[in-house]
Amino acid sequence: MAGEASPVAQNPELVLASASPRRLELLSRLGVSPARVLATDLDESPLKGERPRDHAVRLAAEKARAAAALAPGCLVLAGDTVVGTGARILPKAEDEATARQCLALLSGRRHRVFSAVAVITPDGTLREALSETILRFKRLSDEEIEAYIAGGEWHGKAGGYAIQGSAEGFCAWLSGSHSGVVGLPLYETRRLLRAAGLDVR
């Protein structure tokens, strides 16, 4: 009948637009295993004046669109996690110097982690959600920073740390989504996937 909304397809094929093992593990907690993984290769540089929350939302949507173009008719899930202090976006640490700078900046201070989720349904509809988590790190000694650097957990991580590793011991206080800080906020992800017709635990 004209004007009626199209029915939601039940259990469409899920494509995860990320090769992140931590996102795969988090999805498994929802009883979900993607049919395919499509890692996207995008320029993740912030736009001029872009704030951390907007950066996360934009990148998640761009990753989802890029994967959807390669997997038409599928349900596509993408995410992006950004660490910010005020209006400043902290980089993903690719070398020890960057990780060291990030940890020194976060030492003894509050910061925010924005974890955006984007879903593109088989009919091309984009749905988005954002998790915002506030954390405060203890004051880190030079020795603690160097020991963490030596462990290598920081590599490729936003803000130079992985909360699911030994850096959890740095976190004196957290308000929000622990899974969002890891890389995929489960509450928001579950809500989006269920709305898209996926059978989620």
From Swiss-Prot:
UniProt xrefs under SUPFAM superfamilies: ITPase-like (SSF52972)
Keywords: Cytoplasm, Hydrolase, Nucleotide metabolism
Cofactors: a divalent metal cation
Residues of the active site: D80
GO terms for biological process, alphabetical: nucleotide metabolic process
UniProt keyword S-adenosyl-L-methionine present: no
CC per GO annotation: cytoplasm
Its EC number(s): 3.6.1.9
Family indicated by similarity: Belongs to the Maf family. YhdE subfamily.
Gene3D superfamilies: 3.90.950.10
Enzyme class, broadest EC rank: hydrolase
Top-level taxon of the source organism: Bacteria
Chain's role: Nucleoside triphosphate pyrophosphatase that hydrolyzes dTTP and UTP. May have a dual role in cell division arrest and in preventing the incorporation of modified nucleotides into cellular nucleic acids.
Catalytic activity: dTTP + H2O = dTMP + diphosphate + H(+); UTP + H2O = UMP + diphosphate + H(+)
Site keyed Important for substrate specificity: positions: R22, T81, Q164
Pfam families: Maf
Gene Ontology MF: a single term: dTTP diphosphatase activity
Compartments it resides in: Cytoplasm
Name of the protein this chain belongs to: dTTP/UTP pyrophosphatase
